[in-house]
Amino acid sequence: MFLKKAMLIIDRGSREPEVREELGAICEVVKKKGGYDFTDYCFLEVLPPFIEEGIKRCVSENVDTITVMPYFLYPGMKLKESVKKCARLCHEMRIKVIFTKPLSYHFILQNLLIERIEDLKSKMNISSLNADCDILVIGHGSSDKGARTAFEYTVNGIVPFYKSVNFCFLELDRPNIEEGVRNIVGKGTGLLIVVPYFLHKGAHTKKDVREELYSALEKYRLKEAHITEHLGADVKLVNLILERAREAESNIV
């Protein structure tokens, strides 16, 4: 008997239209490459479609199972809240659900950081060797210790390739962005390349990170600094989603 399957990607949520565009693009490629009968996304908070609506959309397509991808870079509080809420709703609706692992702890994320840096160097015609570049990776930050551990795992993976690799957080953890810039200045900086470790072009990447960063750069009089693009709707993330899905689905009898 042929079983119909859906993939539902749960994101934190954002008011920025670019976030919906990126998630829509990812869902489209996931459906094609993963062989799903239906793919969609929903949000934990901020704006609809919320999780309940996302599940109902899948159910309306008469699928037999829903594979749920908690689309988070860290195993923090928001991820746990998403899984708990989705599990409860699926139980109430009597629909079979399979949860994947989040995106964290995978070499693809390290490759994406390197790719964003190389893209920037190419775009800006930067000829400096990687051995002369100081990298500052900016994460969101979380009160969950597991989130920090996962973030540091990814950042540490690119340490061998650059003059120095440093990290800081937008909020909820230390060092903050100003402290991150100060730490680099204190060690003697080469060419500074800043990587915003965010999935989407949301309010944080468009405004918050840049405001904090530019303020710190001005304070410490750093004139030669460049900021890369965020992670975005990259096919590498699609491949990671599908790998996580296969891992989870293969464990179900």
Question: Where is each model-derived feature located?
Answer:
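Active-site-proximal alpha-helix that buttresses catalytic centers in soluble enzyme cores
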Residues: 1-253
